[in-house]
Amino acid sequence: MRSRLAALLGLGALAGSVHADAVERLARTPEAFKAAVRASGPGDSVVLANGVWRDFEIVFTGEGTAAQPITLRAQTPGKVVISGKSNLRLAGRHLIVSGLTFKDGFSPSSEVIAFRQDAALAFDSRVTETVIDGFNKPGRAAEDYWIGLYGQNNRVDHNHLQGKLNSGVTLAVVLSSPESQQNHHRIDHNYFGPRPPLGSNGGETIRVGTSPFSRTRSLTVIEDNYFEGCSGEVEIVSNKSGGNIYRRNVFVRSQGALVLRHGEDNLVEDNVFLGGGLAGTGGVRVINARQTVRDNYFQGLRGDGFAAALALMNGVPNSPLNRYDQVLDARIENNIFVNVTAVVFGAGADQERTLPPARSRLSGNVFLGAGDKALFKAMAPIDGLTFTGNVVDGVAPLEGVAGFHASAIGRETLADGRVYPDAAARKTLGLKEPVKLLAREETGVAWYPKGDPTIAFERAAPARVTIPVGKLDLSEAGHAGAALEIVDQRK
């Protein structure tokens, strides 16, 4: 009996140790890759050989564990280029993808990287240190996502994404099934490089949810990302779900705003918005209920209206899902605004959007400018807003409204170029110490160069175009991202 029990225990130990020693399988062809994926279990790695993999539709599936994930990686990070008509789909649990470069091609499907394979989703999985550069469909109006996040508990981190020219969100969190809701995804330390103006909706860099699922909680964390020259449209980040956190992100010379478009109970904190004096650069736009915007820093933003440094929108009575819920119970606290163009209350007020912000509070914010310029714009009644402890210097207070105090504030310029109230002023005002500015080099990958958006992607000056009578042809009028000023000589 004892010998039989010992034999059974021995078999159990052997079964439990099948993948105790991780196996690396080097694949040099698509066929070898498929075989390697089929053979891999917890702890194993599938390694793509260095070189160009053209017209390669990658399907990476498996069931790893938290302690022993299954990994797909480049033999050498940056030396494996996925080109032509190619994409990547991953599905299963505890999968990791690392070190790939997508360039010189486009996806034949609706995503370049998808955390799903048909109906099968990815959970507890990660895409890291991967590059997508200019991987655009041939037609500008042809739509795709570069990364589609499905499932739950996935992470997208330390990736480099730049040069999207065609329609579609760069990174979309999709909530179209219960298995992808309340997902607890984490999106962090990514470099979102230049994206020129698309000229229409569909040019967001990040979108979390969509209108039909906007009452759903996503619970996604977007933190420590670097957005540079992300000017695809006025919504750089489009939040369309609830319970999300946007924290310690940096926006540099990006023409648009972080927009709480739909969804409730979202938090925007410790982010930095640096406009560099570029037209159209914005901060945060607030819509819906119970949004919190605190401890953020805004400097040199030249946007107005929907792209103001701060905009609280008017809402639509009995709003359908795809319009604008009223701003209710918002908390705008302890933010610092330096040399920005506009702060707008009741943005978008018109015959449809008739509900001004209500039951909302702006407290402890600091507004620094020069020459007592007019900064605040009330486009609708503001009696639903409470202002307490806000300080202005070099900015005209909101006329006839209590809760703004004009005071000379000592200033200092930090080593990173930000202008802050100095230490004495911070102590007097009860401000916390400046948050360390996330460095560009801390995001993305170390082995792929980051471009210069001020040269390649800065919005062009308007091109004057003459319209011949009866014909309009703009095909030769400008380059991608150009702003066109149309002159009709018939008038």
What are the roles of these predicted feature ranges?
Residues 16-20:
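Sec/Tat signal peptide C-region and signal peptidase I cleavage site
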Residues 24-31, 45-56, 60-112, 132-136:
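Right-handed parallel beta-helix/beta-spiral solenoid domain characteristic of secreted/periplasmic
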Residues 54-59, 84-91, 103-127, 132-416, ...:
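Glycine- and acidic/polar-rich repeat regions and solenoidal domains
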